[in-house]
Amino acid sequence: MRAATAACRDRRGLCRAEFARLAEAVTPFWLHKELIMTTLTGQARLTNSAAYEQVWQAERQACRTDADPDTLTVGVVVVTRNPAFFQTGLSVLNDIRDYVFNRVHIQSEMPLKLLDLAADSLYLAAREKALHFLKGQNKAINVRIIQCASLAEATGKIIYTHALEQRPEFHLGMLFYDQTTPAGVDDSIEQIDRDLDAFYSALQRSGIPAFYTTFSTVAFIRQLRSPFRYLPQQYREIVRSEDPAIFQTELLCLWMDFFEMNYTNRRVKPIGALALHNTLGEQLIQFFERTAAERWLVSYYTGSIISNLIGYLDRHAEARGALILRGPNEHAIACGAMANWQLYRMPFLGVVTSGMMDEFKGTLANLKETAAQGIIVAAENRGNQWYSFQGTLTPTEDMREVLIARRIPFVYIDDVEMIGAGLTEAFRLYHQGQGPVVILATQNVLESTLSLEGAVCDPSPIPVLSADDPLPMSESLAQAIALINRGPERLVWQLGPVSDDEYALIHDIADAAGIALVDSLAHPGSAPKYYQGRRNPHYLGTLAIYGYSPRVYNFLHTNDKLNAMSEQSLFMIKSRVAQITTPFSDGRLERKVHLVQLTHDDRHLSAYADLHLHMNCLAFLRTVKAHLDVDPALRERRRALIAAYLDSPSDVVSQLPSLPMSANYFFCQLNRVIEELIETEGFDFTGVYDVGRCGISAARNVAKTRRGFSGWYGRALMGDALLATGYLAYTSPSHVMAFIGDGAKGIVPDILPAFIDNILTHPQLLNKSITVFYLCNGGLSVINTYQERILFNRTSRQMRLVNVEQPDVEQTVNNFHIQSKTLTHFDEDVIRQALTTSHRLNLFSVVLGHNNEGDGISPGHRQRLAALIRADHDALQERKAWAAQQPESTSTAFDQDPTQEATS
């Protein structure tokens, strides 16, 4: 018997029977305030700290005769070490006791004492409104107030007490979390979020219901957070006022918000975070789970009528292969999708609200151009609505006609019964591989919870020619192989968006045949200067409308004239021969360049190509490798010719440390550091290049180790690369380095807030360095150069950009270091450390001056290159002879010897 009694005792040493007798003996608190402050029921806890327990019971005459006493007990948890905090809260609840409380049970580690509340006019007005509202309610509730010093103690106490209840009817209501303990510091938002999530999860696992909404949990902190502030996910955050009147009014408002929005709202059920089904969300998750080879990307910008769909994706998509990232706007969704499709073939799902299809801007056309596979869900109005808010189906416009004009496939679903058929058609269009598919869906469709088992058909992908199938030896293929095996000494391959497997074959073929490789402004790094940590002996440089390298220019020209078509041939691999890919005019392409084009799309076959290879790239490369038969002497002459053209700067400015720095100087110094890191530490990075002079300079002058992403692709939209950086930071397997001009920076939103949001969700993906160079020269430099070098005009206001210097900032978020710093000089130590330190975002604002020198931007620079070629003709011939005499070896044998370089 003695053991049984001990087992049923609670933590204060009272068994249930004793507790019940004591509770009945307590004087009703409503009528005797002075007794409330002095009468205590309870005993000391087993620990050294004191414990207090009190039960207050309203007398019958104090309750409304028409009020229905609720058998539910609502828990109010107060986590604090501050007696004044707790006692002020008790006093406020006591002040609105009429019409609301039937029974109050208090468990506290602090003395129970009511304070004299401040007679403030605002508080009195709030109290009057609260009582007026409470008079209209037809129930009185039971409340259990639990005060603890920590969340862990509160968790244990609630679970323990709940386990002892014979008929548990306890639902957790409000949680007041005090972070203002003297001599303490506020926890970070993410730490409080994690602690609260663990608290509510523990209650849920123990079967304890809770009103778990934004009105149920409040944390009080000392001061506003700085420099980064964001919305907590599990609670509301308030700075505790030092003014007692303000503090008591805030507590009253918080309680009434909870009571009105949760307890009296029967749509809110005390069962924790309610996970509603969403038909469209589940079907899209299942589709990408079936079709995506590995990860698939989800990104959204929320709106009211798509918030349920987004909430479902947030809860369920990641566990089924999705990576959910956010950007600062809808435009960023398209940029992130394009970059990740081009570099990693990652399909995507984008979700936007009504009227936002236009916010994708020209990047939507780029997604179509690059054939990025993905689905965009956009909210739309019903066709019979009259000028609906944000709708684009009105008597004067129709978004569907816009999509038709842009040749972007879409489906419009405005009936829940048609979801199955609409998704079947959307999936069929997706498998055609012609770019993103748009689903325009009305609110009833977006919020549907109906089951669609068996109602959606996923057609099989359209069969394509497999790279494993042997290519028939067509006449054009035979001619291409003959050019490789027996063709001219100058054989150049410009690489488009080749995959890793394709480049591995290209590298082997170039090594065996002596082929020179170049990349382009649209696909920088497709032919890297360093491959697998070693200098790539086949790499010449960049060939493009802007930014063509001196080595490439010298290789293709003699005395400022293109070499004869019989002496050289240019292969353009996976290319449309777009204007951006070469500096050559239409006339030169037609009459002066022997061009071989490889593309799988017959719509891309160019009229300038002398030889068309309409076939799969990987299959072509495998066929070429199988038929390689290059004469060793020809191969050595080709190799010697490549090695003879050196990778030296073409202008003096690149060596001159002026102030402000020139772009030439900054990138020359940066390249020196990066090449040293590659060669000594195996440094590897993904480059991101925005539209502008400095993006050109970086693509041309900074060594690359792998394919990067370029904003110059397609429409060449300023800002695309910057917005894509926020996504590539989480998907790139290497460090990330972005080169963004001040023009591009100013044309799109700041990426830092969205970047921090993703840090809070995916910190495990950031074991790398992300560096963004904001290159600030105060003008739109490419236009400036056009005006000054081509039209011989002075610069004008239209090219001017205003840069406002910001103070340097360093901050840590979720164990990730962020630094923002202005660089006026090239600080090698700072840059080296930034590039090689993981878990770090570096935002460098680099102060530069404008000039028209170098980087292959203007014809004037081309003429200076020609003069340099003529002046150093003898040195070049000596270099060719030296290279031809070197013994044959592996691909690392052609590393540059700085002591033997000559200007070319």
Curated annotation (Swiss-Prot):
According to its UniProt entry, the protein's GO biological process terms are: antibiotic biosynthetic process
Q: Which residues form a coiled coil?
A: none
Pathway assignment reads: Antibiotic biosynthesis; prodigiosin biosynthesis
A Gene Ontology MF term for this entry? thiamine pyrophosphate binding
Q: Which domain of life is it from?
A: Bacteria
- Annotated stretches, region: Disordered: 879-904
Cofactor(s) needed, names only, are: thiamine diphosphate
Q: What does this protein do?
A: Involved in the biosynthesis of 2-methyl-3-n-amyl-pyrrole (MAP), one of the terminal products involved in the biosynthesis of the red antibiotic prodigiosin (Pig). Catalyzes the decarboxylation of pyruvate, followed by the modification of the resulting two-carbon fragment acetaldehyde at the C3 position of the 2-octenal (1,2-addition of acetaldehyde) giving 3-acetyloctanal. In vitro, it can act on a number of alpha,beta-unsaturated carbonyl compounds, including aldehydes and ketones, and can catalyze both 1,2-addition and Stetter-type 1,4-addition depending on the substrate.
Q: Which family does it belong to?
A: Belongs to the TPP enzyme family.
Annotated protein name in UniProt? Thiamine diphosphate dependent-3-acetyloctanal synthase PigD
